[in-house]
Amino acid sequence: MSDQVIIFDTTLRDGEQALSASLTVKEKLQIAFALERLGVDVMEVGFPISSPGDFESVKTIAREIKNSRVCGLSRALPKDIDAAWNALKGADAFRIHTFISTSTIHVENKLKRTFDAVLEMGINAVKHARNYTDDVEFSCEDAGRTPIDNLCRIVEEAIKAGATTINIPDTVGYTYPSEFGGIIKTLFNRVPNIDQAIISVHCHDDLGMSVANSITAVENGARQIECTMNGLGERAGNCSLEEVAMILQTRKDKLGFTTNVNPMEISRTSQLVSQLCNMPIQANKAIVGANAFSHSSGIHQDGVLKSQNTYEIMTPESVGISTNKLNLTSRSGRHVIQHRMQELGYRDTDYDLEQLYASFVELADKKGQVFDYDLEALMFFNKVDSDPQHYRLESINVQSGSGLVATATIVMSIGEDKKVVEAATGNGPIDAAYQCLMRISGLDINMDDYHINAKGAGKDALGQVDIVATYNGQKFHGLGLSTDIIESSTKAMVHVMNHIHLAKAVAIEKEQLIHIDQV
């Protein structure tokens, strides 16, 4: 049996079912191209019979994709299979995927049929699909809850009818690894013609075991895993593509399997899917979460600096992330601060490590995470200030509404004795406030990230706005709190401006330090 595991991506079919709004054809094509670069063997890109829009998107993707096999889903009905063929026939390589429910609860309560009738429908569907292609996948929906005798029977008959891939879905995420692995093992032991088809699995994550079930299935003979980028999917989602791909790569020593996935494309593909689908990735998500390669514990940070493999079983670079991240918090040790200062270009003789570290811990206790510009300011000014106040927002007034151009008027104090009143228009009230602040400061700031969260509950809840912005190639962070979201957004932008002002002061001191060294 081959050690190659086929990666069947269904982000654009099963994954899209989790979205509140459908993707456009252009967006689907962007994701399809990304999946092709990633190296997926098969991509299921839609359910052609379900809507004219889905039909057209499948047809468009089928014409454009050259290096992955394009698949369309169909029920075990001739009209569905015909629609799939018509959408897919322009592809260089395609697969028709047809399915029918096989569990007793589905057969009796959903289909209102007997199992024998379902068996006949499945056989006829496979035969009909074989009129169009020799690559036919047959799925036994809710296989995880299907009586094993019935499952063995329908798998054998589907292979006889011409199915080249048999998919065993845990449709409701009900099974656990040893149980699901046992189902796959039983099929290999009891289905006489099973060597004539590839056994696939499609596991949902309702109990958080989709990835574990998929890996166990492969250990028991399955050679295709159906999965989605970021684990997107109905309810709790699907088996995560990036997780199974990196498990198979990282633990090849134990498992012995390979895939065609290019791991260097994982991070980029994950971010694209997240952005286009408007589905944020949780920070602690394995492989692709913001914290996946971040270290905050001082002990862990010290270990990683000494040898990366002390706390990292794979490198961030291996999945397309430029580097790991050592978050500077009150738990960070002296070694980490010294290392970061070296990365920023300072020699050990440029500062007193004990004094800097004491100031750092004091600031970190107040602020939480400390950034590079904070650390440099501590070095030069030895002033622990979690909220620099060069720019101080006195008031903001915004006028906006249907048919009106949003206008913001801001009163701001600058330095010790300057007060400025400025007004600006924008594309909405927050943009108007942003334009006004840019006029006041004369800065050219690009907003990279903008997040709104509620602090508290009810009508008195505070809106917390977190901003990441770029100025002169450097990242700056800002935070604002208010019961008014426009005010909290403005405060966050002012916070960024103050950090930039501090960084400018640091740059002057740094230049003088370099000049002294040269003299």
Curated annotation (Swiss-Prot):
Cofactor: Mn(2+)
Main subcellular location: cytoplasm
Pathway info: Amino-acid biosynthesis; L-leucine biosynthesis; L-leucine from 3-methyl-2-oxobutanoate: step 1/4
Catalyzed reactions per annotation: 3-methyl-2-oxobutanoate + acetyl-CoA + H2O = (2S)-2-isopropylmalate + CoA + H(+)
InterPro entries: 2-IPM_HCS-like, 2-isopropylmalate_synth_dimer, AIPM/Hcit_synth_CS, Aldolase_TIM, LeuA/HCS_post-cat, LeuA_allosteric_dom_sf, LeuA_bact_synth, PYR_CT
SUPFAM superfamilies tied to this protein: 2-isopropylmalate synthase LeuA, allosteric (dimerisation) domain (SSF110921), Aldolase (SSF51569)
Protein name as annotated: 2-isopropylmalate synthase
Originating organism: Psychromonas ingrahamii (strain DSM 17664 / CCUG 51855 / 37)
The gene coding this protein: leuA
